[in-house]
Design a protein with these regions (language model features):
Chain B
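Basic amphipathic alpha-helical segments that dock to polyanions
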Residues: 55-62
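Intrinsically disordered, low-complexity serine/threonine- and proline-rich regulatory segments
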Residues: 1-16, 97
C-alpha cells in the first residue's frame, strides 16, 4: 500500500512536471536571495554577498538534476527526448522511413491477421466456468450414431459406457454427456393451429448446465431430476432461438410446446454468451431420457451397441490429461472384455480413447483448419523475419551515412549505452509505426484470409480485440529490437578519430549485411518451395477425373420436409418434379439425390452377402447412397453391367441397388455380381436384403485425394421412410442439360414452383462449382502461400539490390584503380556479378536443407507430389538466381560505368 | 538514488540529513527551505554546516516518501515561499531515524571509550 501511494505521488509529479521545475526554481532563488540579503546586511559588498550565498548553496544545476532524479522520471524524459529526436530523424529521410514502415506494416499486419484467426479459432475458450479443466472423450467434429461394434479410436459412446465412466471417475470431478449428433424437431406452441416450425435440438444429460457452471438467462436450466425416467418433459432454449422465435419474451417460460408430437414445457433460456459446447448450435436442448420420443425410435439407453453420446469431463486438480487418458482407455478395454464378447480380441486390443482438451469445445473450424493455420503462422513468421532483415540492412547502410553524426556524439561525451538506446528507440519507433499501419492492414486482411481459408463464413467477428493488439504490440517491439540491435551495436562502435577527419574507409557491417541477404534468400527459398508444392497439389487435384459429367449438371437444393410433406408422399412428389423438369427443352434427364457429391456427408455401414459367411465387420464396409430413378444417366456415370435405377423401382417392389466397380472388384472378384443379394449389418437379413441390378463405373463422391471406396446406390423410392429420420428427404434435384447449363436455373426454379409452390428451393448451382468449392482449402493454401512467397521474393530482391549497390559505392575507388590498370569493363561486370552469385549460392546452400526440413511439415497437405519434389526445388533455385541477377544488374552497370579519373580523384 | 546522501562536505555525519530535517520540522509547525537551513545551523551553534542546496533534493525525496507535505505561502517579508510540514508518516520516520542514530552513536561511543 505504501508503495502504491508513493507511485501515485510520482505519477502526479510526472503530470505536473513543468510546475515542479518552476516551483523548485523559485524555491532555490528565494533561498539564494535571502542568504545574499543576510550576508549583505552583515556588511559584505553586494558582489561578495552573492558569491558567498552561491558558495554555501552549492551547484544549482547539479542540485536541480538531483531533485529530478529523485522523482525517478529521468528515463521517461530521456525516452521522450529520444522519441522526439527519432521522429525528427525519420522525417528527415522520408524515403527510408516509407520503405521501412510499409514493409513492416505488411509483415506485422500479416502476423496480426493470422494471429487473430488463430485467436478466434484455436485459442478462444467456451464461456463456462473453469474451461481449462474440461476434457472431451473425443473432439471429433463429426456428429452421428454408430451401431454394432467399434474399434480403434472411439469417438462416440453408448449410454452404458457413460454410466460406467460416471461410476468409475477417480480422475474426474464430474462427467456429462450430450448427443453427438442433433435432431430435426417439429415444434408447435401447444394449441396453435399454425404449421409446425423446424428447429434443431440436442439431447443432453441432466447435469449438462450445472456441469458447465451456467446460470439461466431466464427461468431455470436442467437439473439431474429432469433427466430421470418419469420426469415431466422439459426443454431449455438457446438464447439466439429465444430472440429469433419469441423476441426475448419472458412469459414464454412455463409455456407448453409440442416437439415431434410430445408436449414439453419450456423451463428456461441458456445464457446469451453460451451457444453450445459443439459448433453446430442447437436451437434447444432436451434431456437424454426423452430420446425415444424425440427421435421416434427405440430407446438408445437400453442398447449397449448404440454409440451416440459425446462425453465431457472435468479433471480433478493435479491430474494430467495423459494420466486420465491411460485410465479411461484401460477401463474401456476392461468393459469390452467383460461384456458379452461382442468384439473380437483384436478389436478390443485396438480400442482406445483419446482425451482432448475441452476448453474450446468441439469445433469444426479448429479441427479442420488448425494445421492450415499453423502452417500460415509459420509462413507469415518467415515473412516478418525477411522484413526485419531488410530493415536491418537499410539501417546498416544508413548508419554508414550517419557515422559522422554518431562519432561527434561519442566525441562530445555521449555514453555508448545511451547511444544504443537512442538508436534502438528509432528502430522500435519504426516498428511501432509499422505495427499501427499493420493493424489497419490486418483489419481487412483478416476478412480476406478468413474467407480464403474458411470459405467466407463470418467466423471471426470483432477479430481485433485487446489480445490481438497486445500481440501486435509485442511483435512490433520485438521486431524493432531484432532489426535494430545489431546496426545499433555496430554504429556505436566507431573509430571516431578516423571518421571526423574524413579518412575512414571502414568495411563496417559488410559480413553481417551479406549474411542477412543470404538468410533472406534462404527464407525466400523455403517459402517459394512451399508455394510451389501447394500450387502443384492444387493442379493435380483439379486434374483428377471425377467420373461424372460435372460440367453439365445443375443441382437445385430443395426441402420437402420444410414444406410439410411426409416421407410417404415423397416418391410421388419427386417423380412429379422430375417429369416436369424433363419437359424443359435442353434438359436431358433429371433425378433426385439424397446427399450431393462432395456435400460432406457420408453414410457407411458394414454388410453381409447372401450365402457367404459373415466376415469381421472391419473388412465389409460400404458407403451407402440413396438415389432416384435414372440416376446414372443423369450423372453421366457409365453403367458397366446390368441396368440403372428406374421408375419401375417403386414402393412394394423387391429392393434393388447398383454397386460401383470398386465394390464389384473387392467383394465379387471374378464373378458376375448381377442378381446377387446382400443386406446391411450382420448377420444376413433376408427382409432388408437388396438385389444388385447393375454395376456402375467408379466416380469420386467424397474426396479428390482418397481412392474411391466401395459404394452402393439404393433406389430411394422403394422405402420412402427408411433409415434415419435425417435422410428420408432428398437434398436436391439434379438436372443434366445438353447446352449451356448457366442459362437454365430460372426455368428450373419456375418448373419446381409449378409442381409445388410451397417447396423451398434454396439455390441452384452447377455441380462443377460445388466440386471446385471442395478444393477451397487447397486453393487458398496455394494462393496465400504464393502471395507471401511473392512478397518475400520482392523483399529479398530489394535486399540484394541494396547490398550490391552499397558494395559498388564503397568499391568505386578500387574499381577505378582496376580500370586504370587496364581491366576490361566486362571484368568489372563479372567482379560484381560474381559477388552476387556467391551471395545467392550461400543462400541456397542454407535454404535447401531448411526447405527439406520444413516441407516435411506440410507433407500431409500435399497430393500427388513428394515434399522433396526435385523439379520444384530446381525451378525455385533457378528463379532465385535469375531474380538476384536482375536485382544486381543496376549496381553492376553502375560499376562498369565508373570513370577511373573521377574515382581516383575522389577524396 | 543515494547520491543525495553525499553531502560533499564532512560537517554532517553521513546519513543524518533526513534526521536533521525531520527533527527541525518537528520542532515547528512549518518551515521553508531557508529557515530549515538556518535553524540547523543556529541550533548547532554553527557546528553543523549544511551545503544548503542539498536540502532541496532531500526534501524532494521526503515528499515522495510522504514524510512531509509542502504548500505555498507568504513569508514575513511578504515573499512567496514553499513551506514544509511534517506528516504522521514523517513523525513515525523521525522515531525510526532517531533510534537508528542512537544505536550507531552508542556503538561508536562504546568503541571509543573501550580501553
Amino acid at each position: 500500500m505504501i508503495w502504491l501511494r508513493e507511485l501515485s505521488r510520482r505519477l502526479r509529479m510526472l503530470v505536473h512536471r513543468r510546475q515542479f521545475e518552476v516551483d523548485l526554481e523559485e524555491e532555490m532563488r528565494l533561498h539564494l536571495e535571502l542568504r545574499q540579503q543576510e550576508q549583505y546586511q552583515s556588511g559584505m559588498t553586494a558582489d561578495d554577498a552573492r558569491a558567498a550565498a552561491r558558495r554555501r548553496f552549492g551547484n544549482p544545476t547539479a542540485l536541480r538534476e538531483d531533485s529530478r532524479i529523485a522523482w525517478g522520471w529521468e528515463w521517461f524524459e530521456h525516452l521522450a527526448q529520444d522519441v522526439r529526436y527519432g521522429l525528427r530523424m525519420l522525417r528527415k529521410s522520408p524515403g527510408f522511413t516509407a520503405v521501412a514502415v510499409l514493409t513492416l506494416a505488411l509483415g506485422i499486419g500479416a502476423n496480426t491477421a493470422i494471429f487473430s484467426l488463430i485467436d478466434a479459432i484455436l485459442l478462444r475458450t467456451l464461456p463456462v466456468a473453469s474451461p481449462h479443466e474440461l476434457v472431451l472423450f473425443s473432439d471429433s467434429p463429426e456428429g452421428g450414431t454408430n451401431s454394432g461394434t467399434q474399434t480403434g479410436h472411439w469417438m462416440r459412446f453408448s449410454s452404458e459406457n457413460y454410466t460406467y465412466f460416471r461410476g468409475h471417475s477417480e480422475n474426474f470431478k464430474e462427467l456429462c454427456a450430450f448427443q453427438s449428433s442433433w435432431n430435426h424437431l417439429k415444434i408447435r406452441v401447444a394449441g396453435a393451429a399454425e404449421r409446425p416450425d423446424l428447429a434443431y435440438g440436442r439431447l443432453v444429460s441432466g447435469n449438462f448446465f450445472s456441469f458447465l457452471g451456467l446460470t439461466a438467462a431466464a427461468g431455470r436450466l436442467f437439473s439431474p431430476d429432469d433427466d430421470r425416467p418419469g420426469a415431466s418433459p422439459a426443454v431449455v432454449l438457446n438464447y439466439a432461438y429465444w430472440t429469433r422465435k419469441f423476441q426475448n419474451d419472458v412469459s414464454i417460460i412455463g409455456k407448453v410446446v409440442e416437439v415431434n408430437g410430445t408436449t414439453f414445457t419450456i423451463i428456461g433460456v441458456a445464457p446469451r454468451t453460451f451457444s453450445d459446447v459443439k459448433y453446430d448450435r442447437p436451437d434447444l436442448w432436451l434431456p437424454l431420457v426423452f430420446q425415444p420420443q424425440v427421435m421416434s425410435t427405440n430407446s438408445y439407453a437400453d442398447d449397449p451397441q448404440m454409440y451416440w453420446l459425446s462425453i465431457m469431463a472435468r479433471l480433478k486438480p493435479g491430474v494430467t490429461l495423459r494420466q486420465a487418458q491411460a485410465v479411461v482407455s484401460s477401463q474401456l478395454k476392461q468393459i469390452l472384455a467383460t461384456q458379452a464378447q461382442r468384439e473380437t480380441t483384436q478389436q478390443i486390443a485396438n480400442s482406445y480413447i483419446e482425451l482432448a482438451p475441452g476448453a474450446g469445445g468441439i469445433s469444426y473450424l479448429r479441427v479442420t483448419y488448425s494445421e492450415a493455420l499453423q502452417i500460415l503462422a509459420g509462413i507469415v513468421g518467415i515473412v516478418l523475419l525477411i522484413v526485419c532483415a531488410n530493415v536491418a540492412n537499410l539501417l546498416l547502410s544508413r548508419s554508414s551515412a550517419r557515422e559522422k553524426e554518431i562519432s561527434i556524439r561519442l566525441a562530445i561525451g555521449a555514453s555508448r549505452s545511451r547511444l544504443i538506446r537512442q538508436l534502438l528507440t528509432e528502430s522500435v519507433l519504426l516498428a511501432t509505426l509499422g505495427g499501427a499501419l499493420g493493424i489497419l492492414a490486418a483489419r481487412w486482411g483478416v476478412d480476406i484470409l478468413a474467407s480464403l481459408v474458411t470459405g467466407g463464413t463470418s467466423i471471426v467477428k470483432d477479430s481485433i480485440d485487446a489480445r490481438v493488439l497486445l500481440f501486435t504490440a509485442c511483435v512490433s517491439i520485438l521486431a524493432g529490437i531484432l532489426f535494430g540491435l545489431v546496426p545499433a551495436l555496430r554504429s556505436s562502435r566507431i573509430d571516431f578519430a578516423a571518421q571526423v577527419n574524413g579518412s575512414a574507409r571502414t568495411r563496417l557491417g559488410f559480413g553481417f549485411a551479406n549474411g542477412l541477404v543470404a538468410c533472406q534468400i534462404a527464407a525466400c527459398l523455403v517459402l517459394l518451395v512451399g508455394a510451389g508444392l501447394f500450387l502443384r497439389t492444387l493442379q493435380k487435384l483439379a486434374d483428377q477425373e471425377l467420373g461424372f459429367d460435372e460440367n453439365h449438371i445443375l443441382v437445385a437444393r430443395i426441402n420437402a420436409e420444410a414444406a410439410g410433406y411426409s416421407p410417404a408422399q415423397t416418391p410421388t412428389l419427386y417423380q412429379a418434379l422430375i417429369d416436369r423438369i424433363e419437359a424443359i427443352p435442353g434438359v436431358l434427364s433429371a433425378t433426385v439425390d439424397y446427399s450431393e457429391p462432395f456435400g460432406g456427408s457420408t453414410w457407411t455401414s458394414n454388410f453381409t452377402i447372401e450365402g457367404l459367411p459373415s466376415r469381421p465387420p472391419g473388412q465389409m464396409k460400404v458407403h451407402k447412397e440413396l438415389v432416384g430413378p435414372h440416376y446414372f444417366e443423369t450423372e453421366g456415370i457409365p453403367i458397366l453391367l446390368g441396368r440403372d435405377i428406374g421408375p419401375q423401382d417403386r414402393p412394394g417392389t423387391p429392393l434393388v441397388t447398383v454397386i460401383n466397380q470398386t465394390m464389384a472388384r473387392k467383394f465379387f472378384p471374378g464373378v458376375n455380381p448381377i442378381g446377387r443379394r446382400f443386406s446391411l449389418g450382420s448377420p444376413f437379413n433376408d427382409n432388408e436384403a437388396m438385389t444388385i441390378v447393375g454395376v456402375a463405373a467408379d466416380a469420386r463422391y467424397y474426396s479428390l485425394r482418397d481412392p474411391v471406396p466401395a459404394m452402393e446406390f439404393c433406389a430411394a423410392f422403394q422405402i420412402p421412410d427408411q433409415g434415419s429420420h435425417n435422410s428420408a428427404y432428398a437434398e436436391d434435384v439434379e438436372v443434366r442439360v445438353s447446352g449451356n447449363p448457366r442459362a437454365l436455373p430460372t426455368e428450373i426454379r419456375a418448373a419446381l414452383a409449378q409442381v409445388s409452390d410451397s417447396l423451398p428451393v434454396t439455390r441452384v448451382t452447377l455441380l462443377k462449382d460445388e466440386v471446385s468449392a471442395s478444393l477451397r482449402l487447397n486453393r487458398s493454401a496455394a494462393e496465400v502461400s504464393s502471395a507471401f512467397a511473392g512478397l518475400a521474393l520482392f523483399l529479398s530482391c530489394i535486399g540484394v539490390y541494396g547490398t550490391m549497390a552499397y558494395r559498388v559505392s564503397r568499391r568505386t575507388h578500387e574499381i577505378g584503380i582496376r580500370l586504370a590498370l587496364g581491366a576490361h569493363r566486362s571484368d568489372v561486370l563479372w567482379l560484381i556479378t560474381k559477388e552476387c552469385l556467391i551471395l545467392v549460392s550461400v543462400g541456397l546452400v542454407i535454404g535447401v536443407p531448411l526447405a527439406l526440413a520444413s516441407t516435411r511439415i506440410i507433407a500431409s497437405q500435399l497430393f500427388g507430389i513428394r515434399a522433396t519434389d526435385p523439379l520444384t526445388f530446381a525451378t525455385v533455385a533457378i528463379l532465385l538466381v535469375l531474380v538476384a541477377l536482375a536485382a544486381c544488374y543496376v549496381p553492376a552497370r553502375r560499376a562498369m560505368r565508373v570513370d577511373p579519373m573521377v574515382a581516383l580523384r575522389y577524396e | 538514488m543515494l547520491r543525495s546522501y553525499d553531502l560533499h562536505r564532512d560537517e554532517i555525519p553521513p546519513g543524518t540529513l533526513y534526521l536533521l530535517i525531520l527533527k527541525t520540522l518537528a520542532r515547528s509547525r512549518e518551515l521553508h527551505g531557508y529557515e530549515i537551513a538556518n535553524s540547523i545551523q543556529r541550533i548547532s551553534d554553527g557546528v553543523l554546516e549544511v551545503e544548503e542546496g542539498s536540502l532541496y533534493p532531500a526534501l524532494q525525496r521526503m515528499l515522495i516518501k510522504g514524510w512531509v507535505t509542502a504548500k505555498w505561502g507568504t513569508t514575513a517579508g511578504n515573499r512567496h515561499a514553499r513551506y514544509y510540514q511534517l506528516t504522521t508518516a514523517g513523525r513515525k520516520q523521525l522515531g525510526v531515524e532517531m533510534s537508528q542514530f542512537e544505536r550507531v552513536i552508542g556503538a561508536i561511543t562504546r568503541v571509543i571509550e573501550a580501553v
